[in-house]
Design a protein with these regions (language model features):
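Phosphate/diphosphate ligand-binding glycine-rich loop within oxidoreductases
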Residues: 1-41
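Glycine-rich adenosine-cofactor-binding loop
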Residues: 28, 47-67, 78-79
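Rossmann-fold NAD(P)-binding glycine/threonine-rich loop
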Residues: 19, 31, 134-183, 187-189
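Rossmann-like adenosine-cofactor binding region
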Residues: 93-159
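Conserved S-adenosyl-L-methionine
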Residues: 68-73, 153-157
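Short helix-loop-beta connector
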Residues: 20, 43-49, 70, 130-131
Length: 195
């Protein structure tokens, strides 16, 4: 017998399984890891205009919690329009729409596409970037991802997915062992490795 969390069921993904007595519980900690990382970086979502590039599993895993933080609007761009439209249709009451608004000024730009990992990142031409724009790449690697390299041309507020990875793992650890692990040292070590 098992139980699946509302979040894991909604996003159709599981990354953590716990067992109590004879029952299994299936959960996804990716969204929590993402939101915890934003909180740790003092990035507030409420009332913000957000552009997300990509519509794959990583984006799906964060949207469930992202929309509940009451952004003003979320636009999703993807190479495969149908995939992005399907994702948008999951959130009919949360101002999540396909496409990029003409001359849109976004407070936060999130990259969830694999295009941000190899080669160069080609941003949508319609967006307006200011020195206050925050950039977040759900990808991570040793060194800077192409998305982060591009974003650093405009802003100092550029973040990769390392914090999300570590925070979602910490959440899984807490579910398994009932203990909040200390992650500061892990984050410092990973940052040092990627420089």
């Amino acid at each position: 017998e098992g139980e699946i969390s509302e979040e894991a069921k909604f996003i159709n993904a599981v990354n953590t399984i716990t067992k109590s007595n004879r029952n299994f519980k299936l959960e996804s900690t990716d969204g929590m890891g993402f939101m915890t990382d934003l909180k740790n970086k003092e990035i507030d979502i409420a009332g913000k205009n957000i552009l997300i590039v990509g519509a794959g599993a990583a984006v799906e895993s964060i949207l469930f919690r992202l929309v509940r933080s009451e952004p003003s609007k979320i636009n999703i761009l993807n190479r495969t329009k149908e995939k992005a439209l399907r994702l948008c249709s999951n959130y009919p009451n949360h101002n999540v729409e396909y496409g990029c608004q003409e001359d849109a000024e976004y407070d936060i730009i999130i990259n969830g596409s694999s295009a941000g990992l190899t080669g160069s990142f080609n941003p949508p031409k319609e967006i307006i970037i200011t020195n206050k724009t925050i950039f977040y790449d759900l990808n991570y690697s040793l060194g800077k991802t192409p998305f982060c390299e591009w974003a650093l041309e405009f802003s100092k507020s550029v973040h990769d997915g390392t914090g999300m990875l570590v925070n979602q793992a910490a959440q899984s650890f807490k579910l398994w062992f009932g203990v909040n692990p200390q992650i500061d040292r892990v984050l410092e070590d990973l940052k040092r490795l990627s420089e």
